[in-house]
């Protein structure tokens, strides 16, 4: 029985086709983070043809807003972002912080429109991945298909972890879990797991963790007194990671 022709759910129109930029996935230092490790040279050539442009987003600028048409997902190449959803009463809720090598915009797959907002925490760069082309490649390249499944599964795990964090943990446990989570993500990208800079404000951390700025500051001060962390401004040093895990 012949296969029916594949029609992508999110086709990329000709006018949306980006012009080629100098950056290439095949030579990017982050390719082991963003891409499957077992792509062939021919597959990487296809990826280079697909992800052929980047976008610079200055600190405080928005990458996408609620209601924007979903055409692409984004991979953070440099910098960092926060994602926000708006409640019906107009209040905002920070739902995550994305660092180098992580994706943005996957939620738009569901309705064809972005349901939240992504704002740069610092001057940042993203790689633009047209989702219609990615769908086609996933159908033909099994490692890429599996990688996209992993990305979507990771989003589900992240959201369920946040629900657990907000629903069952004490304020002390929330801040400890937040620092350990950042530490492991930086380590996975080849950065120091023990020393890093918090690009978000303590007020933003509190909004994400469901607590006030003063509570975040009080918990960090408590960790310093216990010798678990050293903090100077936004610079964080994890002195005793095992101690943080035991909180």
Residues covered by each model-derived region:
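Polybasic "coupling" helices that flank or enter modular domains
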Residues: 139-212
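Cyclic nucleotide-binding regulatory module and flanking cytosolic helices
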Residues: 2-59, 103-104, 108-110
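Local beta-strand/beta-hairpin segments that build beta-sheet-rich folds
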Residues: 63, 95-96
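Short phosphate-coordinating micro-motif centered on Lys-Gly-acidic
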Residues: 62-68
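Cyclic-nucleotide recognition modules
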Residues: 96-161
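Short alpha-helix-to-loop micro-motif enriched in aromatics/charged/Gly
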Residues: 88-95
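Glycine- and acidic-residue-biased ligand/ion/polar-headgroup-sensing regions
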Residues: 60, 71-84, 99-101
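Phosphate-/nucleic-acid-contacting segments
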Residues: 184-247
């Amino acid at each position: 029985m012949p296969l029916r022709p594949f029609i992508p759910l999110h086709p990329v129109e000709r006018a949306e086709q980006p012009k080629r930029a100098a950056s290439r996935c095949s030579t990017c230092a982050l390719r082991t983070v963003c891409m499957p490790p077992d792509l062939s040279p021919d597959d990487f050539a296809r990826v280079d043809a697909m992800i052929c442009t980047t976008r610079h987003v200055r600190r405080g600028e928005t990458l996408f807003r609620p209601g924007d048409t979903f055409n692409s997902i984004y991979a953070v190449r440099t910098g960092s972002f926060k994602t926000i959803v708006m409640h019906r009463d107009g209040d905002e809720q920070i739902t995550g912080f994305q660092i180098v090598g992580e994706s943005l915009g996957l939620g738009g797959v569901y309705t064809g429109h972005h349901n939240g907002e992504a704002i740069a925490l610092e001057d940042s760069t993203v790689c633009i991945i047209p989702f219609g082309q990615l769908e086609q490649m996933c159908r033909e390249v099994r490692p890429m298909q599996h990688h996209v499944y992993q990305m979507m599964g990771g989003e589900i795990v992240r959201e369920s972890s946040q629900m657990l964090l907000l629903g069952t943990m004490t304020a002390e446990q929330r801040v400890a879990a937040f620092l350990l989570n950042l530490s492991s993500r930086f380590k996975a990208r080849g950065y120091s797991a023990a020393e890093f800079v918090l690009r978000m404000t303590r007020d933003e951390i509190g909004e994400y963790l469901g607590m006030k700025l003063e509570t975040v500051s009080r918990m960090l001060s408590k960790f310093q007194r216990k010798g678990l962390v050293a903090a100077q401004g936004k610079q964080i040093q994890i002195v005793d990671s095992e101690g943080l895990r035991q909180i």
